[in-house]
A protein has these predicted regions:
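Intrinsically disordered, metal-sensing/regulatory segments
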Residues: 1-227
Length: 227
């Protein structure tokens, strides 16, 4: 449980530090890390999480339906988060604090749900935490654009980092245990959607980007190797 709390929190802190002290490298680094983390998250979901769900003897059609529900839920969340989960959120100056609050709230829900299947799943925990680094970079930037102080922006990131472990903690409640596989299926749908969007989005002008393809391939290979 210590890892479940510490690693996601460390990930968002790292994202803030990279944004604060490495401004010149942020854009390129963020895109490469998105490619790697999205590929790794999608691959771990396909290699580990989905097989585990379907091996539990539950109604496969129901599990499949809930996974589809997770995909739909993520689509709805992204209409509010402006695509921050895969690196495309933009905040106009006119949006201000209210615009940031809307994006943060959607990411808050996203982070809570993605924490549900993490307890005891080291590989999935690693995948989610890696994915949090570029999201934290985006969220920190948006917070500053919304005229939050650096301390307030950092505080928002700490809260964002803690909500994922909270999602994992609720699975220890007796009344939640019965529904955990179904909640995991909902999370799987979210992972599939986010990972696929990152994996299949094109460069501007559909240009060939060898570095990004290499990062995507490395994410797949790492997931296969440890899975």
């Amino acid at each position: 449980m210590t890892l479940t709390i510490g690693i996601p929190l460390d990930a968002v802190i790292l994202g803030a530090l990279i944004t604060e002290f490495g401004a010149k490298m942020v854009s390129k680094f963020k895109q490469l890390l998105l490619g790697f983390s999205g590929s790794f998250l999608l691959s771990i979901t396909l290699i580990e999480l989905l097989p585990n769900l379907f091996e539990q003897g539950l109604d496969r059609r129901l599990i499949s339906l809930i996974i589809l529900g997770g995909i739909l839920l993520q689509m709805i969340l992204e209409s509010f988060s402006k695509g921050a989960e895969h690196g495309h959120a933009h905040l106009n100056e006119s949006d201000g604090f209210s615009g940031f609050t809307l994006i943060f709230s959607a990411l808050f829900v996203h982070a809570f749900i993605e924490g549900i299947p993490l307890d005891g799943e080291k590989h999935l925990l690693l995948a989610v935490s890696l994915h949090k680094v570029p999201i934290a970079m985006i969220l920190y930037t948006l917070a500053l654009r919304a005229n939050l102080s650096k301390i307030q922006a950092f505080g928002a990131l700490i809260l964002f980092g803690l909500i994922t472990p909270l999602g994992s903690l609720i699975t220890h409640l007796d009344w939640v245990l019965t529904y955990t596989p179904y909640l995991n299926a909902l999370s799987a749908g979210i992972f599939l959607h986010v990972g696929a969007i990152i994996l299949f989005e094109s460069e501007k002008g559909h240009r060939f980007n060898l570095a990004r393809i290499v990062m995507v391939l490395l994410g797949m290979l790492l997931a296969y190797w440890i899975g």
